[in-house]
C-alpha cells in the first residue's frame, strides 16, 4: 500500500470521508498534524499523525465504504505506523469509540487516559473532540 502526504488543499476530501463515518474533522487544518492518503490501485482511505516527538496521536483513520471488509484497514494502519517510525515516533496513542477491538488485534493496549503524556492529553482530540467514554489505547 502506498502512502502520500496530503497537501492542505486535499483536506476537504479527508474531511468529507471523516464526516461520512461520523468521525471528528473540525481540527484538520490545525498545526502539528500530518495526514496521508493511502492507495492500493485506487484510493483506500486516510490516516494521520498528530504532535511532535516520541509520543504522537494516531488519528483520523478512515477506509472508504466500498473498500471495507477486505483487510485494507490493517494494512493502512501498519503503513501509517511505519510512517510514524520514520519520523522518530516511539509510542502511538489513539482514542476510539468504535474500533477498540480492531486496534487491540494490532497490538494496541488499553491505558488510563490520566497517564497520557502531556502533549497528547492537551490535544483537541483528548480535550474536546472525542468523548470521555472513548477507549484510550497505546502501542510502543
Where are these regions (language model features)?
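Short amphipathic alpha-helix that is part of the acyltransferase structural core
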Residues: 1-27, 42, 134-136, 140
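A generic "binding-loop/recognition-motif" signal
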Residues: 10, 54, 98-99
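C-terminal "cap" of GNAT-fold acetyltransferases
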Residues: 116-140
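Conserved beta-strand in the GNAT
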Residues: 42-50, 55-62
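Conserved GNAT acetyl-CoA-binding A-motif
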Residues: 82-98
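Conserved active-site alpha-helix within GNAT-family acetyltransferase domains
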Residues: 97-125
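Conserved beta-hairpin
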Residues: 32-45, 139
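Conserved acetyl-CoA-binding loop-helix of GNAT-fold acetyltransferases
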Residues: 63, 69-82, 94
Amino acid at each position: 500500500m502506498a502512502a502520500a502526504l496530503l497537501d492542505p488543499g486535499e483536506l476537504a476530501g479527508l474531511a468529507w470521508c471523516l464526516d461520512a463515518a461520523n468521525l471528528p474533522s473540525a481540527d484538520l487544518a490545525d498545526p502539528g498534524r500530518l495526514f496521508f492518503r493511502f492507495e492500493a490501485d485506487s484510493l483506500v482511505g486516510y490516516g494521520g499523525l498528530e504532535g511532535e516527538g516520541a509520543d504522537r496521536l494516531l488519528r483520523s483513520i478512515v477506509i472508504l465504504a466500498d473498500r471495507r471488509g477486505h483487510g485494507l484497514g490493517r494494512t493502512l494502519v501498519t503503513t501509517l505506523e511505519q510512517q510514524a517510525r520514520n519520523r522518530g515516533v516511539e509510542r502511538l496513542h489513539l482514542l476510539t469509540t468504535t474500533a477498540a477491538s480492531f486496534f487491540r488485534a494490532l497490538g494496541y493496549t488499553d491505558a488510563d487516559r490520566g497517564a497520557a503524556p502531556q502533549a497528547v492529553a492537551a490535544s483537541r482530540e483528548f480535550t474536546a473532540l472525542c468523548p470521555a467514554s472513548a477507549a484510550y489505547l497505546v502501542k510502543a
